[in-house]
From Swiss-Prot:
GO terms for biological process: translation. This is Large ribosomal subunit protein eL34. Pfam families: Ribosomal_L34e (PF01199). Residues 41-69 are annotated as: Disordered. Residues 50-66 have a biased composition (Basic and acidic residues). Belongs to the eukaryotic ribosomal protein eL34 family. GO terms for cellular component: ribonucleoprotein complex; ribosome. The keyword Hydrolase does not apply. GO terms for molecular function: structural constituent of ribosome. Gene3D superfamilies: 6.20.340.10. Keywords: Ribonucleoprotein, Ribosomal protein.
Amino acid sequence: MKPMYRSRSWRRKYVRTPGGRTVIHFERRKPKVAHCAMCGRPLNGVPRGRPSELRKLPKTAKRPERPYPNLCPSCMRKVIKAQVRASLS
């Protein structure tokens, strides 16, 4: 095993070859799930992937197509309500 692969930042994937041997493939770990900027809840509709994988996706697949895509839907509603109330008063 190369010294660079001894670190646990590389995920070890055990692969069975056609010849019957089990070999280890090293791959980078997936990043953590995206979280809401206000409450910290995990965001739906945002894929977990390395930048090289996300680069291949269209922009619409990377984040929700609605106002404030960095907030969860409930926090987004709170922000929009606060803005409307502020503009009315």
